[in-house]
Design a protein with these regions (language model features):
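Low-complexity, intrinsically disordered/propeptide-like segments
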Residues: 5-8, 24, 38-39, 52
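Conserved S-adenosyl-L-methionine
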Residues: 3-21
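Short coil/loop residues immediately preceding or within conserved phosphate-binding loops
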Residues: 12, 34, 72
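A generic signature of intrinsically disordered, low-complexity regions enriched in glycine/proline
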Residues: 17-19, 32, 149, 183
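Structured catalytic-domain cores with a bias toward divalent-metal coordination
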Residues: 37-194
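Structured loop/turn residues at beta-strand edges in well-structured enzyme cores
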Residues: 5, 30, 172
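Core SAM-dependent methyltransferase catalytic element
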Residues: 20-42
Length: 194
């Protein structure tokens, strides 16, 4: 049972009662069995997302395939030297919001596994087809707003399938999620941080 929970080592101490009970307690409760069990959960030695596996202490930058290869997104996975929580950072839900996309690119370049605890997953441009075709922030083939179709549909339109892949293949693997947005390509806003 413990192995199914990821426990890698178990230690028992049946002599603990001699160290924690007073002489009076030993006389009164000596027949009560007392022991300490210590179990340690093994730290994951790698992180797998889509078709990419990254070992602890390593960094991957490149394409990550989802939905049996039907969806390919540019990403970075930083698997820190020390185990911990997993953070997802996404940009480009609206492909014309360049500030979030650029922030993802820069974070992916700067963050290093030696200075990271846990795992950081950066998906730089979720709406990749519209971004690559400079076609605004809606789905290229279906005209849908990715931000409005979650959790998606595996048999739906382009954006619905993308939302479904993110919902089913990415969300279950992360503890925290930051989705970066900014002014869209049609808005006259100066990029800023506040």
């Amino acid at each position: 049972v413990l192995e199914s929970l990821g426990v890698c080592s178990i230690q028992t101490d049946s002599e603990i009662w001699k160290r924690v009970w007073s002489e009076e307690e030993r006389l009164n409760y000596a027949s009560t069995p007392m022991f300490l069990v210590r179990a340690e959960k093994s730290a994951e030695q790698s992180f797998q997302l889509g078709d990419v596996t990254v070992r602890r202490g390593e960094k991957y930058q490149g394409d990550i395939s989802f939905a049996n290869g039907d969806i390919v997104l540019p990403g970075t996975i930083i698997c820190g030297k020390l185990p911990g929580k997993t953070m997802l950072i996404t940009g480009g839900v609206h492909s014309g919001e360049y500030v979030g996309i650029q922030a993802c690119v820069e974070l992916g370049a700067e963050l290093q596994p030696e200075k990271t605890v846990g795992t950081i997953v950066i998906l730089k441009v979720l709406n990749r087809p519209a971004f690559e075709n400079r076609a605004g922030s809606l789905g290229l083939s279906d005209g849908k707003n990715l931000n409005r179709v979650f959790p998606g549909n595996p048999n739906g339109t382009e954006m619905e399938r993308l939302a479904w892949a993110i919902t089913k293949e990415v969300y279950p693997k992360v503890d925290y999620y930051i989705d970066l947005h900014s002014g869209d390509d049609f808005e006259a806003l100066t990029p800023y941080v506040y």
